[in-house]
Regions:
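Flavin (FAD/FMN)-binding glycine-rich loop and adjacent Rossmann-like elements that form
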Residues: 1-244
């Protein structure tokens, strides 16, 4: 859930620095499991000071089927109740910083990390990520960790400095379609690999690739995304600064 709190005490907050989950004495560790806050099902809390006395949060989770409008509506109602409990917990366990604070806003829409993905000519998998796999049709690099937010998710070691994998153009080209390409979080991956490739840097990489590819295709006499000249595409991407 995304929320903004205002009237946070600037001085007192400067003394604690943050309320991130990684802070061992942070308030979320007291809020989670407390019967007063039953909607808080995990310890996810990420905060960012965005203005004087204004703190933005990415905190908590709500399970939802994003293909079902009823489920989405229920999740948005439950999510705002969850936000209220997080606010009250922060007031209780960090009163010096948050005692006079108030909820200024919540996100207008439900944020969905994983929903529909499109089946392309190639599906990038967890095994590819673990192997730091290279591809002949690679159009960029990625080194982000496997960031899956379900509580029972397996945790995989992050890449070391300098390690990365290739992103194949073939996971951007939907099978059976000639005039549609995909970029960002809807590219063809399995669930765990999606946890790495859904974020902004690889989305920028795949977006740049399909943009350049589209420019090439539109000049063709018989446009077809599956007939892109990969070497020409890679050459142009290198020229504009993309790491291949």
């Amino acid at each position: 859930m995304l929320l903004i709190k205002q009237n946070v005490d600037p001085y007192e907050f400067s003394l604690i620095g943050n309320v991130h989950t990684n802070r061992k004495d942070g308030p979320i560790h007291s809020i989670y499991g407390n019967p007063k806050y039953p909607l808080v099902k995990d310890k996810h809390m990420n905060d960012k000071l965005i203005g004087p006395g204004i703190l933005g949060f990415n905190a908590g989770h709500v399970t939802v089927d994003s293909t079902d409008p009823v489920s989405l509506t229920e999740a948005m109602i439950k999510g705002r109740k969850l936000v209220r409990q997080l606010h009250e917990g922060l007031v209780e366990f960090e009163p010096k910083s948050f005692g006079a604070s108030f909820l200024a806003s919540t996100a207008n829409l439900m944020g969905i990390r994983e929903s529909r993905r499109i089946k392309c000519d190639y599906t990038f998998t967890l095994e590819d990520w673990l192997a730091r796999k290279e591809f002949e049709d690679s159009i960029g690099r990625n080194c982000y960790y496997i960031d899956v937010h379900k509580q029972d998710a397996t945790v995989y070691p992050r890449y070391k400095k300098g390690e990365s994998h290739g992103i194949p153009f073939s996971c951007l080209t939907p099978a059976g379609l000639k005039n549609v390409m995909v970029a960002g979080r809807c590219i063809s991956t399995d669930s765990y690999a999606h946890g790495s490739l859904r974020v902004m840097p690889p989305s920028l990489v795949t977006g740049e690739a399909v943009g350049v590819a589209a420019g090439q295709i539109c000049k063709s006499k018989s446009p077809d995304i599956h007939n892109v000249d990969i070497q020409k595409l890679r050459k142009r991407l290198k020229e504009v600064g993309q790491l291949i």
